[in-house]
Amino acid sequence: YCIGKRIFGQMPLRCTFNPIAGRESRFPNGKVGKAEEKKRVAIIGAGPAGLEAAYIAAQRGHSVEVYEATDRLCGGQLRIASSSPCKDILQHIPDFFRVQLGRLPNVKIHLNSPVTAENAASIEADTVLVCTGAEPLVPNIPGIDGANVKKAQDVLLGKAEVKGDVVICGGGQVGVETALELIERGHKITIVEMLPDLILKEELMTRIVMMKKLAAAGVNILCSHSVT
């Protein structure tokens, strides 16, 4: 992202996890100013967005409580992404936030604490930030509920058993990363993609490496095709 999307795209430097990167002139010494009014801030979701929001809010002097449904920091989309063999470096992100937030006495993190319609009213806060991430888009295809149909996130996390040859519907970043994982497990892969080519939104150098790996593994690629 920082190189392929920003620098090669002749855009200002930005970082996926450090919002101050490229904006240092606005934040002397990398710190934000203190808030004039201290508030109680509740953050729902302990992914990168929620934890960064907690860090900034606490630096400004607010009292922060973070509620996470899973048993770990970054237990949602980042955990799924970091399970890919080409993105295992992302597994260090939760440790970074754990250290940073551990230095701030005005941050409390509640794991295994999903916020629901039933218990939301019990949260006492002046401000609530919803940082709950996203769910995968499941297309309305006949047979999509079949026992042999698995979600990419379940495959990457080892929650879904995969047998035999595999057809992957979608040749974007998630589809190709899942294909690379299944190749390492010894599966024969076919990727079906609606667009004229795979991972068109991926930055150039990463795309070249991933496409070479698919070619070396003999993956069957069907572009400009739809699953119906």
Residue ranges and their predicted role:
Residues Y1-E37:
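Cysteine-cluster motifs in flexible loop/terminal segments that predominantly coordinate metals
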Residues G4, F17, I80, C86, ...:
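Generic structural "secondary-structure junction" signal
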Residues C15, L101, L129, V149:
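Conserved hydrophobic/aromatic pocket- or pore-lining residues that grip, position, or stack substrates
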Residues R23-R26, L73-L78, V138-P139:
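Short acidic/His/Gly/Ser-rich catalytic and metal-binding motifs that mark active-site loops
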Residues A35-R72, I109-E124, C131-I141, D145-N148, ...:
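Rossmann-like dinucleotide/flavin-binding elements
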Residues S63-R103, L180-H225:
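Rossmann-like dinucleotide-binding cores of NAD(P)H-dependent redox enzymes
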